[in-house]
Amino acid sequence: HSGIPFIKPWEGAELKEKLDSVIALNPPAIGMDVDAAGLVTLRKMGRPVTPMGVAELTEVCSYLHEKGQKFIVKGIMTPSDALKAASAGCDAIVVSNHGGRILDHCPGTAEVLPRIADAVRGRMTVLVDGAVRTGVDVLKMLALGADAVLIGRPVSVAAIGGGLEGVRDYFGNIRQQFCQAMLLTGVGRVSDISSEILYQG
């Protein structure tokens, strides 16, 4: 299975160069973490990144669609930004605060996910990451409106500690926890998961 490459919002010719290099790999989709525009470390290294407005996203999206590629935008934290991504023609968004490392005091993704999912439901795929560690976490994110859930750091830890088998074991545990949580919340199919299973005090 091939992965989905994510690139930074590089400036000018470097962006096209990066896009062309990943297009050549023929991945299932190509992503861009637009919140990386806040990575001061890249500028200090002489690798400037730039904010992406609707016009810039539309241009990138059109270019990738011409090449037969789907485009995912990562770093969405508000309904208005999600709607901008939809109007630009993006195929999917990732609700993500970059692990809280870009802007201090950002809300968690679980807090903002429901309103974002409601804003673009039926127009694009909504993915989410952020502090997802167990199968129960996966269930909660789906119940809050995500179409699918991304897990990053724990997979890296599993790979470093146990290689391919470590990753398989980790996802095996996630699946077992997820199925048990579905059973205990009375959900028979993933498509039946809804906010009704959540306790919100």
Predicted regions and their residues:
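Alpha-helix-loop-beta-strand connector modules within alpha/beta enzyme cores
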Residues: 1-4, 49-71, 105-130, 172-181
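Glycine-rich beta-to-alpha transition loops that act as phosphate-gripper elements at the mouths
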Residues: 9, 72-79, 106, 125-138
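Catalytic pocket-lining loop regions of alpha/beta-barrel enzymes
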Residues: 87, 94-96, 106-110
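Short beta->alpha connector loops at strand-helix junctions that form conserved
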Residues: 6-9, 96-97, 130, 152-153
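Short, solvent-exposed loop/turn segments at secondary-structure boundaries
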Residues: 44-45, 104-107, 161-163
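Active-site entrance/lid segments in N-terminal catalytic domains of soluble metabolic enzymes
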Residues: 1-83, 87-88, 99-102
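Hydrophobic residues within beta-strands of alpha/beta enzymes
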Residues: 30-32, 93, 149
